[in-house]
């Protein structure tokens, strides 16, 4: 571990030099790239340097204990030694976690797509509930949300809805939401009080940068049309909605807000995210043949969570976490779930680094 930390510290110093190089300062792409890399290493280097300082302090104290016979001084030195011996192992654990390879997409903005699945109108209402939950969670984290495309249900909620979440770390906070979400509750229209089970699927797509996904203009077919609301009525009287088709893959992205220019930009953003997601899924499938993740496969059809309204219970099936606080969670208080899933992922990666042992 310490050899790795020395390499990280050495790279950090190299980046300091690069960032003061005029050739780098005058190259916006290089400056952004090296600045981000340095920022990613900053905490690891800070903790490692603090660790080394405390390690030296402990050695100095041990040397002083061997040289002094003064009772008061010995007592004081022993207290300092004991405190450092307690602190250093905690710092070592922190350094292990800091060395875990970071998901390169963690800091990115995302596109979230929610689709009503089994359960008819109740599934659409639940899709709307999930949309509201994620919007509140995003707001609590200082992220900005914006609807890209929405197909409303006649009885409330959405048949499907996609929206962007913008802000540093959006993907790291929402990536575990990929999969099928199941709700168990009595629908408002149910007179007999029977509990119905419905599902909605969630896809979280990291937004792609131009360098990560290349799209040629000749591979695109762009159509404009009038958008429709619930029940099929026309929302706009002009052809402002945009549909972009990527001809080589057949991937389609649409946006149906009021401005055609904004719709084109939004649809293009979604198209890039979907193509990038296809690329990531292919890579993950190769990786999945070698290992199975504790926090799920990322498969959109995998049931990941159940929301049981009669018992006010939410269960995340990937890590066996059950919380009796459904109302708070549906109000966007997802921190406890996200933190538990993040810890599970970190533990798993740590095992891999240590060849299967913690």
From Swiss-Prot:
Post-translational modification: Methylated by PrmC. Methylation increases the termination efficiency of RF1.
Main location per the UniProt record: cytoplasm
Record keywords: Cytoplasm, Methylation, Protein biosynthesis
InterPro entries named among the record's database cross-references: PCRF (IPR005139), Pep_chain_release_fac_I (IPR000352), Pep_chain_release_fac_I_sf (IPR045853), Prokaryotic/Mito_RF (IPR050057), RF-1 (IPR004373)
PTM sites of type N5-methylglutamine: 233
One GO location term (cellular component): cytoplasm
Annotated Pfam families: PCRF (PF03462), RF-1 (PF00472)
Keyword check for Transcription: no
Coiled coil: none
Single GO MF annotation: translation release factor activity, codon specific
SMART domains xref list: PCRF
Subcellular location: Cytoplasm
Function summary: Peptide chain release factor 1 directs the termination of translation in response to the peptide chain termination codons UAG and UAA.
Family (UniProt): Belongs to the prokaryotic/mitochondrial release factor family.
Name of this chain's protein: Peptide chain release factor 1
Species in which this protein is naturally found: Staphylococcus epidermidis (strain ATCC 35984 / DSM 28319 / BCRC 17069 / CCUG 31568 / BM 3577 / RP62A)
Lineage start: Bacteria, Bacillati, Bacillota, Bacilli, Bacillales
Protein encoded by which gene: prfA
């Amino acid at each position: 571990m310490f050899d790795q930390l020395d390499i990280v510290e050495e790279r950090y110093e190299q980046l300091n030099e690069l960032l003061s190089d005029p050739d780098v300062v005058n190259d916006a792409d290089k400056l952004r790239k090296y600045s981000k890399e340095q920022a990613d290493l900053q905490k690891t280097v800070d903790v490692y340097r603090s660790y080394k300082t405390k390690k030296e302090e402990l050695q100095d104290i041990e040397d002083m204990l061997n040289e002094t016979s003064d009772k008061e001084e010995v007592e004081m030195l022993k207290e300092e030694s004991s405190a450092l011996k307690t602190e250093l192992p905690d710092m070592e654990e922190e350094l292990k976690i800091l060395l875990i390879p970071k998901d390169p997409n963690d800091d990115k903005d995302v596109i979230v797509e929610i689709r009503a699945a089994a359960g008819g109108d109740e599934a659409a209402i639940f899709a709307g509930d999930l949309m509201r939950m994620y919007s509140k969670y995003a707001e609590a984290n200082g992220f900005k949300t914006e609807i890209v495309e929405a197909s409303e249900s006649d009885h409330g909620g959405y048949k499907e809805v996609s929206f962007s979440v913008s802000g540093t770390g959006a993907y790291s906070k929402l990536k575990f939401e990929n999969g099928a979400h199941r709700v168990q509750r009595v629908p408002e229209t149910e007179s007999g009080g029977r509990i119905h089970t419905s599902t909605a699927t969630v896809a979280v797509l990291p937004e792609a940068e131009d360098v990560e996904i290349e799209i040629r203009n000749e591979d695109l077919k762009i159509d404009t049309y009038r958008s429709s609301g619930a029940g099929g009525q026309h929302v706009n009287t002009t052809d402002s909605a945009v549909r972009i088709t990527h001809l080589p893959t057949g991937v389609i992205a649409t946006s149906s807000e009021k401005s055609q220019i904004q719709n084109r930009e939004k649809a293009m953003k979604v198209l890039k995210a979907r193509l990038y997601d296809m690329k990531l899924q292919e890579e993950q499938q190769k990786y999945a043949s070698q290992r199975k993740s504790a926090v799920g496969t990322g498969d959109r059809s995998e049931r990941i969570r159940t929301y049981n309204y009669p018992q006010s219970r939410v269960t995340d099936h990937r890590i066996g976490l059950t919380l009796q606080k459904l109302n708070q969670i549906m109000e966007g208080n997802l921190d406890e779930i996200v933190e538990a899933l993040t810890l599970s992922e970190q533990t798993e990666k740590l095992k891999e680094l240590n060849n299967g042992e913690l």
